[in-house]
Swiss-Prot record:
GO terms for molecular function: electron transfer activity; heme binding; iron ion binding. Its cofactor is heme b. The chain crosses the membrane at residues 21-35. It is a single-pass membrane protein. This b-type cytochrome is tightly associated with the reaction center of photosystem II (PSII). PSII is a light-driven water:plastoquinone oxidoreductase that uses light energy to abstract electrons from H(2)O, generating O(2) and a proton gradient subsequently used for ATP formation. It consists of a core antenna complex that captures photons, and an electron transfer chain that converts photonic excitation into a charge separation. One of its GO terms (biological process) is photosynthetic electron transport chain. It comes from Psilotum nudum. This is Cytochrome b559 subunit alpha.
Length: 83
């Protein structure tokens, strides 16, 4: 026996005017907010990732590659000291 859950069918939702009035504002707003978050550099600050011009410095031009399995912590410390 299947019962009625009381939910609106999806087809009714996406064909309603109310759905498109709400989403015609929220979807572009989310896109613009994401674009501003990345373009202003706030994403780099929030997540702590280096900016594109900070990957290589004057003193360190090689790739910071971890090569040892057992001394990886020392290598990470060495790389972070050069920043």
């Amino acid at each position: 026996m299947s019962g009625n859950t009381g939910e609106r069918p999806f087809a009714d939702i996406i064909t309603s005017i109310r759905y498109w009035v709400i989403h015609s504002i929220t979807i572009p707003s989310l896109f613009i907010a994401g674009w501003l978050f990345v373009s202003t550099g706030l994403a780099y600050d929030v997540f702590g990732s280096p900016r594109p011009n900070e990957y290589f410095t004057e003193s360190r031009q090689e790739i910071p590659l971890i090569t040892g399995r057992f001394n990886s912590l020392e290598q990470v410390d060495e790389f972070t000291r050069s920043f």
